[in-house]
Amino acid sequence: MKVAIYSRVMDENQRQDIELFFDELKNQKLQPLIFHTYFEQIKNTIALPSNAEVFHSPEHLNSEIQAIISLGGDGTLLDTVTLVRSHNLPVMGINFGRLGFLASIGRAEVKTAIKSLVNHSFDTAPASFPQ
């Protein structure tokens, strides 16, 4: 299963959480497709799965992608939704900082959330965008 990963910036305070996140992706046999600017920030400091790939634009998100995971707060989640609005992809928001209103999955729930994604045991809510 292939999932896209989007984030704006790697905060050094979140390094351990990010490592655990990518470890869980590997444990669940998920292949990450990481947004290029985030990949450049983490590639030398985080042990990424060997099958990790990079994407540069929404056009690189093909039918193999099962979901996109946003790592950050509500602003990052809104950026993620804007990025993939022309795709019919579920978006999961994981917040490693203060708990947000939109990105409501906290660090303690990462493993459970990823397992739910793998098992397709999650609910989606429709979103609409102004034209």
Predicted features and spans:
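Short acidic low-complexity segments
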Residues: A52-I65
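Short internal beta-strands
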Residues: L30-Y38
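A short, Lys/Arg-enriched amphipathic alpha-helix followed by its capping loop at the start of a domain
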Residues: L20-L30
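N-terminal beta-loop-helix "entrance" segment that forms/cooperates
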Residues: T37-V54
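Short glycine-rich anion-binding loops that position phosphate/pyrophosphate groups of nucleotides
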Residues: M10, D74-T76, L99
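Short glycine/serine/threonine-rich phosphate/pyrophosphate-binding segments
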Residues: Q14-R15, G75-V81
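Catalytic core of DAGKc-family lipid kinases
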Residues: F101-Q131
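Extreme N-terminal starter segment of soluble prokaryotic enzymes
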Residues: M1-V3
